[in-house]
């Protein structure tokens, strides 16, 4: 029987259809008929998305994404209407329901408006924010207890219309009243925030606590290293930094989130890229979670659903394109990760086949990959998946029991479940109101079959046993209490759907009046509503549409269910225990006998809302062996006994210098509720003797390996985890590759193939790409654990360009610079460069346009541009000898932009994009620079420089927010030198930092920064340039700078006059520089050994030959130097500088020297019987290792032998850092000072660093991460300022306006800042980006003006002076000016040439020059003072209005002659 009701047409977007009331005749004998279903169908011309239902409501909601409208049904889907948001202006893009308040829903637009409803979608309001909304991420973060507390983590993404593409910035807000008032913006610098109380399982101290990742105002690093974690529990009235790590604090904040009862924070150390994970359960107390674990790879783990006592992580463990993982859990007691399952099935986006049934303690499902070995050989192989189940939280796993009748004669037979998190029907349907009842798709056999071979299975005992419910792949759902199962066939055209009233044992067919293709099936979120919704595609012959069916069984269930706490026939509920044996309840794997009430399968009734809690109770069981597992730091052996990990025993013995210690080998499985009995010995501590853990002694060990050919380079894959072995790659002169997995003790040949290139990944320390002569590329992403290969898309280029351009944030993205038609003849007419792009680690390649010569990712670690932006060099179509710089953000599919013409080349250095451009005549070479991606500006060089295209630029670095370049000024072969230029912070104006700096014929420059302390660098100059015009030998001298290239001085050797008594005053210490060093030698300094520098050189007027040189050390960052050896040595820093090794580099030797007191005393270790020449010394690049690798040979062409010397056993105890108790700490605070002992001002501050005390006998290991601590701020000096835009700096430090340019107008920029009411007139100077100085010389303190419309606020802050004050000020100023004028006139006649000059800070000035500079510096501020005075007097009589960039002090500046003809080098 059908009862037809008409569905109202809705504005032409829904086709008029009919609903029907379908009465289904019972197929079951008995006095009670099977219930009917009320069925309604509505047809739409576009696909409904974001479908949602509500608890305790008949309302249903969805989004028509094509038109941006929200549709509402108030009768469980029988009828629909749109336009429910009155006054809607912007199309809706996304619907989001409140996580904890079911009646609240939010509608996101891409405008600046968010609509919201607090009554299940019936009535709507809105709030606006300052910028358009980005829906690439879900912006809302909800409070678990107070629904009115909401955080809105928006990202404002804008496109400048230029080649940079889209750039996103944080745009965060919060509300305390559910957006009844305008949302409050988060503090400036906030990038992501959450509530501490963000889970129903959380227990926090303050409900108002907010935790944020925020920009650290004291950090000059790049993101994420510039960000730290802060919290506030008073709505940002106060903000407290979170101290997670002794040295890092919380710098390097990579992410924060909540899961289960845990807050999780991840930090990345900028120096080592090591990942630190911290957990908290109250938002205040945090504990490191990886303390005894080897660690996870950066950006390769996934946080999974968690419980109140454990949370789960899946970590990548294979090829990223066909990934597998390792499942870990962490519990609230130990805060230590434990491996729970290997070879889990992961997806490229990080999702994992994992399912947790949260209301049943310990019940989880996971799919594992059975053919991992095949995938490691060939990542293209399809995965073979099988399912596992655990009932004890991951301690033990088993296959899923298959239905008894399904296996037939198969040897390996179990049930495998479809758990793909990307597919809505690939899940397990369950409900806490129907405990133990599970509904899932899968297949029976030895593996999970394809979707079209899957069936529908049911379990009624929490996954222990399963039955086949329906054949074929289905969409499925069950009502909240399990009263009704509903299913439709999938992957086919159908006209029938099915429902079951007895937990899937039998099914009733409902025939529809049309054929459909089901898409999704939903059950009502209201557990008391027996309603299902089916979304399907239909076809009326003209076009495909979407039908939304609702099936309402609730009205026709014959009775209301009866519930009582006693089991009887009248009770519609039964008592179900979580585990049975022989029909009787027994203790579960979680140490308790637990039961729930659930509706009987035979009861056909509707559950009243008075029934809310079906959890009965549990009784704790007596503990057995099965309730325990190995404690953290222990591992189970073959006999099932828990044995302490060897490295843990060694670590504990070393850290405390113990003879014995106690540990408890066992612990209860997290969440287990059993009660230990008196005889239970599992919790008793076990005593361990340190002698049994390979106790470190004092023996240094060495390992010799003889190669059969010459090794010319060694590549270290140190990775992100210092505790693990470093993977080494050796490259031979014959193009063979060797590898070592044990730090260099033993080596194996990678293959018989010859390799043309070995390219470490520029941004990923775990990765290297190796290219064979046959264009096969081998690569690893996990530090050599697995190597994969692909075929290069073409032969390599023939002109020396780097083969690969690596992306800084997307490791799978590669650009390849190849060639075609060049192998036989690289000069052939059809030989050309080609460029390819891959987004999947080289599995597939796309060729870019054919006229491109070279391309590079534009995004750098400090350059904020679109991820897809690439720069390319393209041949000019009209002139093949001219080239253009172009860009694209879609790999030239639709868009490209031409940036510059006549380009020679380009490079990206941190935040700078640098392009070399030649003029139209081809006679001069210049640079164009961009730092913001919006425009390029031509660099202004000193007037004396005119660089020919055949001359060389060498980009040195940009670590200090200034670009350092070397411009070659003499190109005579063998006598090359040039000038080092330093730019202002935007890279457009350069001053000469140091002239006549040495370089070699290849282009390398004798310029090297001190690692670990910014602003200090060494350089070698050619002192006899006039003698070399016709050839000759360079005479080199070494200089050092402590203020980032503004001043340079000679090196000070302590006792130098005793070393070379007859040398005289012309002798200084000079060092052999970068151009003379082996390409793979260790650097002069390292970040890990801050302040320590070693070099080979001589105390002489000029640098003498290397073989005649001696070896020197500085322990104070280059201020003073000491001789340590009479001959040249190679060296390396081990254990963060606590051990220094050195070995003779010219003469054959079999002895290595080592020092544990920063080179004050040395001991020797004989590493072989035979003496050989040591050609290279190498160690971990981070400087934290304890091993050093020597490459030795008998003569220049003989095969190489490697000697690994292991100093790991030198000290047994691990150093302890105790910031509070300096006497107990093994580290001392070191403050850099100048030669007089005065603390050095570096970047405007006096800083301290921690180094191991030379008097403490311990090993640093990874216990020390060098961190600078600011002790005090310095007064500002001229070194803290640079020239403002459109100004250039003369050699004396004076900033003058560039001829033809105007001073920058920054009024709008300054006044646009929140709460700004005044703007400051530029003076030509601005603070350098890195300085933190305070007070002192205010060179950037220009005249203040009120912002437009803020005059009242301005004059409140700056009251006008009274009449007498003005009169006295004028009289005093006139007298002072008269005296000053006389003094200035006197000195200017004697010493000055008329320029305004800044006082010099150099300690090398003579007294007369110093006095003159001071006088000039003091009185050069008088014109600015008069300008301010004039402005204050004038404002009494003239209405003050904002100026338009006119500078009144310019008139006073013009009273002085600007010395603008002096652009020489310093």
Swiss-Prot record:
Annotated family: Belongs to the VPS10-related sortilin family.
SUPFAM superfamilies membership: Oligoxyloglucan reducing end-specific cellobiohydrolase
Topological region Lumenal: 34-1363
Gene Ontology CC annotation, any one: trans-Golgi network
UniProt KW keywords: Glycoprotein, Golgi apparatus, Membrane, Nucleotide-binding, Protein transport, Receptor, Repeat, Signal, Transmembrane, Transmembrane helix, Transport
GO biological process, one term: Golgi to vacuole transport
Name of the protein this chain belongs to: Vacuolar protein sorting/targeting protein 10
GO MF annotation list: nucleotide binding; vacuolar sorting signal binding
Membrane protein topology class: Single-pass type I membrane protein
Localization of this protein: Golgi apparatus, trans-Golgi network membrane; Prevacuolar compartment membrane
Listed SMART domains: VPS10
Residues in BNR repeats: 71-82, 115-126, 388-399, 457-468, 498-509, 738-749, 778-789, 836-847, 1039-1050, 1112-1123, 1153-1164
Keyword Repeat (UniProt): yes
Glycosylation sites: 465, 545, 986
Role, per record: Functions as a sorting receptor in the Golgi compartment required for the intracellular sorting and delivery of soluble vacuolar proteins, like carboxypeptidase Y (CPY) and proteinase A. Executes multiple rounds of sorting by cycling between the late Golgi and a prevacuolar endosome-like compartment.
Membrane-spanning intervals of the chain: 1364-1384
Effect of residue 1419 to A: No cpy1 secretion; localizes to Golgi and vacuolar membrane
Stretches assigned to the Cytoplasmic side: 1385-1466
InterPro entries, per database record: Sortilin_C (IPR031777), Sortilin_N (IPR031778), VPS10 (IPR006581), VPS10-sortilin (IPR050310), WD40/YVTN_repeat-like_dom_sf (IPR015943)
Keyword Kinase: no
Pfam families assigned: Sortilin-Vps10 (PF15902), Sortilin_C (PF15901)
Position of the signal peptide: 1-33
